[in-house]
């Protein structure tokens, strides 16, 4: 549909970056065919064949507050050898559907596998059925459909040389891919300039960040277990990730051992090992195979009923057709212990707190949450009966003001979705020793922050995990 948006809206949309860190599920380099998603009988880490390197595909996006949903499917992916020859195909999961705004300011694992060592001069992508939704100044959702299919070849300059375990990052600038006529948005058109491709080796386990191997708040259903390893089907992305464990791995909330994980919906925290394989430091149970979880943005609250726009989910009744749909969630009767904070890495304990509260009285429209339920997810627009409500990290962007040693304010743009939804114009940000800061924060400058967003009854308070 066509939609009139302001220049300010376009500048906000331009900040949206759709990122694939190509943890390449390279169908064993030279040519496995077929779609992904099948689980091997033995989910243990696959030995790296001679002449190949363990690599990882991740996805994410940079915060863009005006955008409340961006969905896309990856139909094909390959790398072109610099010396010539056929492109090396990357096997992507069948029927994958990726929603990116929930990963604002963060890279998330997509798939893992083995990539042939060598030098590559281009990446080739086919993206299908892209969709973008943002809020107008009056709070009306504006939906833009992209092309049914878009194939793009992105030159790599300089060439990409793969010689050891690696994380490949592909940033897709959605703002640069929007077409307009007379100030009216009329479509999405991906071009080579939409993409920036970089690469990093896995970082030291204790200090990893999202772009060099960190595993933070990765959710899915365990589809196979073997010995000390398990395989996780991640959300609606459809990808399968295999994790190793050992005696240091912590099991929580109803899961006690690897053997107890089968068919469970879980959250995993961990890191990428030096050889490129994945290790689980913590595994937390969410629901049994009769339940589900749905992640999304609270767009409205009426009494005790939340309206949630779904970003992702897993479990009974959840499928890719429900990504982007709205659901109602009635929190009446939930005890204080049912409201939790999904802190992940870098926040420590002690949340929620008096300064950073999260309960039935301080939950607020504009926050990202995860709804855990013991029942199946209903059809779109249906009512989800919650068992637990978990606060999740989200991205916020704007202009810096009142900078101090460990605090600053973000002034939200007039068309910011958070501002429109909540009616608030400022977010107060607190940093700590674990905040991953990649840019200089100065009054008057633009900033993109990912963290936990709390409502204290009068104002927004955010603890920053990342500043970009």
Model regions and ranges:
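A short macromolecule-binding patch
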Residues: 238-248, 314-334, 415-432
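Compositionally biased regions
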Residues: 7-12, 49, 240, 434-435
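Bacterial N-terminal signal peptides that target proteins for export
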Residues: 2-20
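A short, solvent-exposed, low-complexity linear motif enriched for acidic/polar residues
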Residues: 33-305, 309-313, 338-400, 406, ...
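C-terminal functional regions that serve as terminal interaction/effector modules
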Residues: 350-352, 409-423, 428, 439-442, ...
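Intrinsically disordered, low-complexity segments enriched in Gly and acidic/Ser/Thr residues
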Residues: 306, 394-434
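C-terminal motif of bacterial Sec signal peptides marking the signal peptidase cleavage site
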Residues: 28-31
């Amino acid at each position: 549909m066509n939609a009139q948006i302001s220049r300010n809206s376009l500048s906000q949309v331009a900040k949206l970056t759709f990122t694939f860190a190509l943890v390449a599920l390279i169908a064993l380099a030279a040519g496995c065919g077929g779609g992904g998603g099948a689980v091997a009988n033995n989910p243990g880490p696959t030995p790296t064949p001679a002449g190949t390197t363990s690599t990882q595909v991740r996805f994410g996006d940079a915060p863009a507050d005006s955008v409340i949903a961006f969905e896309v499917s990856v139909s094909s992916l390959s790398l072109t050898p610099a010396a010539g020859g056929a492109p090396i195909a990357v096997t992507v999961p069948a029927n994958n559907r990726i929603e990116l705004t929930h990963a604002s300011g963060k890279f998330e694992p997509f798939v893992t596998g083995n990539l042939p060592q060598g030098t590559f001069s281009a990446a080739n992508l086919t993206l299908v059925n892209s969709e973008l939704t943002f809020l107008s100044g009056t709070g009306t959702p504006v939906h833009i459909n992209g092309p049914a299919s878009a194939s793009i070849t992105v030159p790599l300059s300089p060439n990409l040389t793969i010689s050891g375990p690696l994380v490949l990052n592909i940033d897709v600038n959605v703002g640069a891919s929007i077409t307009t006529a007379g100030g009216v948005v009329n479509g999405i058109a991906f071009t080579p300039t939409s993409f920036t491709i970089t690469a990093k080796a896995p970082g030291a386990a204790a200090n990893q960040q999202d772009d060099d191997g960190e595993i933070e708040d990765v959710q899915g259903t365990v589809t196979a277990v073997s010995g000390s390893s398990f395989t996780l089907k991640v959300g609606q992305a459809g990808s399968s990730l295999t994790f190793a464990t050992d005696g240091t791995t912590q099991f929580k909330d109803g899961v006690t051992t690897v053997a107890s994980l089968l068919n469970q919906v879980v959250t995993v925290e961990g890191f990428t090992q030096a050889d490129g394989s994945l290790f689980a430091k913590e595994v937390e149970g969410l629901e049994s195979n009769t339940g589900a979880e749905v992640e999304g943005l609270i767009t409205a609250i009426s009494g005790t009923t939340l309206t949630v726009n779904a970003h992702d989910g897993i479990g009974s009744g959840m499928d890719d057709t429900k990504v982007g749909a709205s659901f109602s969630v009635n929190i009446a009767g939930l005890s204080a212990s049912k409201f939790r904070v999904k802190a992940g890495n870098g926040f420590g304990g002690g949340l929620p707190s008096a300064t950073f509260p999260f309960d039935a009285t301080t939950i607020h429209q504009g926050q990202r949450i995860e709804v855990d339920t013991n029942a199946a997810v209903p059809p779109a627009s249906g009512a989800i009966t919650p068992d637990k409500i978990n606060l999740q990290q989200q991205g916020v962007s704007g202009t810096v003001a009142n900078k101090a040693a460990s605090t600053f304010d973000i002034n939200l743009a007039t068309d910011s979705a958070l501002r429109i939804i909540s009616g608030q114009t400022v977010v107060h940000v607190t940093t700590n020793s674990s905040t991953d800061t990649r840019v200089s924060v100065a009054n008057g400058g633009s900033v993109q922050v990912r963290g936990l967003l709390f409502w204290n009854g009068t104002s927004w308070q955010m603890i920053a995990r990342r500043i970009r």
